[in-house]
């Protein structure tokens, strides 16, 4: 992602075409995610509801509020402010599951949080953006809800349904599903970087500073929040990473 984003920044036409397919690319990524979800993954609701509720609550409170505070503290322009808030109000990204695994965190909890924060996103994300971003730009609540349903909820549920109907076929291609989702997200992000290269230059270092602070605050506050409820290292690590890593692809699609 970093390498191709740099290429897109230096040579904008290389990936700028991808912006014409923003919703499609995100839909492909979400559909790929749905294909990897088994019904057993939903058992965490009944077997570990405490950790799941703690994680999802932290997800939809810490990052949105940190985004709002950063936008106010740095006196961001309306465009930048709503962009930061959009990212903050989105659910966790699937990359958090990989990072949690590498960090020796509770991968099952991370996957559960990603699934359920994604399923909650069509209802919670638009409301949060409406409440926190309304002071900068006019936000159409209904239009945003419909957008999230279209590019997130329907593709994910479609993927889950296909897996249940054709499990043997899906298992055969299971190893390449993450690659398909990654390619879609990389093209999506690279396209946005390429088409907004001039704006990124104009904004200067402030964008970099705000993004870094947003992620660091999310990780640290997520970890602290988990520790308040006496979650062990593995569970606290999963919560911290899930809170600190957002589904930026969804934010791009909604922007």
Report each predicted region and the residues it spans.
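Alpha-helical transmembrane segments of multi-pass small-molecule/ion transporters
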Residues: 1-255
């Amino acid at each position: 992602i970093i390498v191709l984003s740099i290429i897109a920044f230096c040579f904008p036409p290389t990936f700028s075409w991808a912006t014409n397919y923003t919703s499609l690319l995100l839909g492909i990524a979400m559909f790929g995610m749905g294909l990897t979800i088994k019904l057993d993954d939903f058992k965490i609701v009944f077997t570990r509801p405490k950790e799941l509720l703690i994680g999802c609550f932290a997800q939809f409170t810490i990052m949105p509020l940190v985004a709002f505070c950063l936008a106010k503290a740095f006196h961001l322009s309306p465009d930048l402010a709503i962009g930061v808030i959009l990212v903050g109000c989105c659910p966790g990204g699937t990359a958090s599951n990989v990072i949690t695994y590498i960090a020796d965190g509770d991968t099952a909890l991370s996957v559960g949080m990603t699934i359920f924060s994604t399923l909650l996103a069509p209802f919670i994300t638009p409301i949060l953006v409406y409440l926190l971003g309304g002071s900068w730009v006019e936000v159409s609540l209904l239009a945003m809800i419909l957008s999230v349903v279209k590019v997130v909820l329907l593709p994910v549920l479609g993927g889950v349904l296909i897996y249940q109907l054709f499990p043997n076929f899906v298992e055969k291609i299971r190893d390449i599903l993450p690659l398909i989702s990654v390619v879609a997200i990389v093209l999506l992000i690279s396209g946005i970087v390429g088409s907004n290269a001039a704006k990124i230059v104009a904004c200067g270092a402030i964008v970099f500073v705000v993004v870094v602070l947003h992620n660091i605050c999310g990780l640290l506050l997520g970890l602290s929040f988990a520790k308040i409820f006496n979650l062990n290292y593995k569970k606290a690590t999963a919560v911290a990473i899930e809170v600190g890593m957002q589904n930026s692809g969804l934010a791009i699609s909604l922007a």
